[in-house]
């Protein structure tokens, strides 16, 4: 991470918490029925870390049986590596809000979008895995799969600013690498071919897009800004800035301009 990128990230994290609180206060005025829920998740919290811990723990109550203990546990994990997970989460949140036309405001992205929640639970599991607590990491992986239908192995390497749209039926294998700014739709699989050991899952480069039902198998590379079309089966590399279509997938030309709002990190729908 460059110094400029680090500074932008710090500015982003500092700006999001007061904005979330302001939007929560406004929503309490618009709909007083939500005041208790918004107080529980945001307005009663002193920090973004406290709030995110609560938001992630509460939907798991039916799985774990104790959202309060999960909230405290998640709070401790979110503090690992100088709150690196928090920084990644806020980059994810900003990407979701700024590029998704279906997301009306920042508080909706934070409270209601399952892709954001599932991704942060992966980040918690990955933090545990990296600390050597693999059993706990796999438990969080399982809870996430049960609650959200998203199964990301905690050893997978995932960058910042991901956009998981709908977040149903997503599977990402143990040795997969997903770089910054990637967009993934529902029912996408990053799997192995069962013929390899070691690094056996795909590498998805920056700002690539994997559309609904795409399957990418083996240690193949989807290049930067490339798009894998809906239902495509990829078993060979996809070059940067190219569109792969079909089963088996084939290169059908450059990525059309209308994909730019999601493949170009500088584009926005807001």
Curated annotation (Swiss-Prot):
* Localization per Swiss-Prot or TrEMBL: Cytoplasm; Nucleus
Q: What is its EC number?
A: 2.3.1.30
Q: Which UniProt keywords are present, listed alphabetically?
A: Acyltransferase, Amino-acid biosynthesis, Cytoplasm, Nucleus, Transferase
Annotated InterPro entries = Hexapep (IPR001451), LbH_SAT (IPR045304), Ser_AcTrfase_N (IPR010493), Ser_AcTrfase_N_sf (IPR042122), Serine_acetyltransferase (IPR053376), Trimer_LpxA-like_sf (IPR011004)
Question: TM segments?
Answer: none
Entries under Pfam families matching the protein:
Hexapep, SATase_N
* Pathway named in the protein's UniProt entry: Amino-acid biosynthesis; L-cysteine biosynthesis; L-cysteine from L-serine: step 1/2
Q: Which reaction does it catalyse?
A: L-serine + acetyl-CoA = O-acetyl-L-serine + CoA
| GO CC annotations on file | cytosol; nucleus
Top-level lineage group = Eukaryota
Q: Name one GO molecular function term.
A: serine O-acetyltransferase activity
Q: Which GO terms describe its biological process?
A: cysteine biosynthetic process from serine
Record carries keyword Transport: no
Q: Which family does it belong to?
A: Belongs to the transferase hexapeptide repeat family.
The name on file for this protein is Putative serine acetyltransferase
Organism equals Schizosaccharomyces pombe (strain 972 / ATCC 24843) (Fission yeast)
């Amino acid at each position: 991470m460059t110094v400029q990128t680090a500074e932008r990230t710090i500015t982003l994290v500092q700006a999001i918490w007061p904005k979330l609180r302001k939007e929560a206060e406004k929503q309490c005025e618009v709909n007083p029925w939500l005041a208790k829920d918004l107080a529980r998740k945001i307005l009663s919290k002193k920090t973004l870390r406290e709030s995110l811990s609560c938001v992630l723990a509460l939907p798991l109550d039916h799985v774990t049986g104790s959202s309060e203990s999960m909230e405290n546990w998640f709070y401790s994990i979110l503090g690992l590596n100088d709150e690196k997970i928090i920084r990644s989460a806020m980059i994810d949140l900003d990407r979701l809000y700024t590029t998704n036309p279906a997301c009306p405001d920042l508080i909706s992205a934070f409270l209601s979008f399952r892709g954001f929640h599932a991704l942060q639970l992966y980040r918690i599991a990955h933090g545990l895995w990296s600390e050597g607590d693999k059993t706990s990491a796999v438990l969080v992986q399982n809870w996430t799969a049960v609650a959200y239908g998203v199964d990301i192995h905690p050893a997978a390497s995932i960058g910042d600013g991901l956009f998981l749209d709908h977040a149903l039926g997503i599977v990402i294998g143990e040795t997969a690498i997903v770089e910054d700014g990637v967009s993934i739709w529902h029912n996408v699989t990053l799997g192995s071919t069962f013929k390899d050991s070691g690094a056996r899952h795909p590498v998805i480069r920056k700002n690539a897009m994997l559309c609904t039902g795409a399957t990418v198998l083996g240690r193949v590379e989807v290049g930067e800004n490339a798009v894998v079309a809906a239902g495509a089966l990829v078993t060979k590399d996809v070059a940067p800035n190219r569109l792969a279509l079909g089963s088996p997938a084939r290169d059908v030309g450059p990525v059309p301009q209308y994909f730019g709002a999601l493949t170009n990190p500088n584009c926005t729908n807001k």
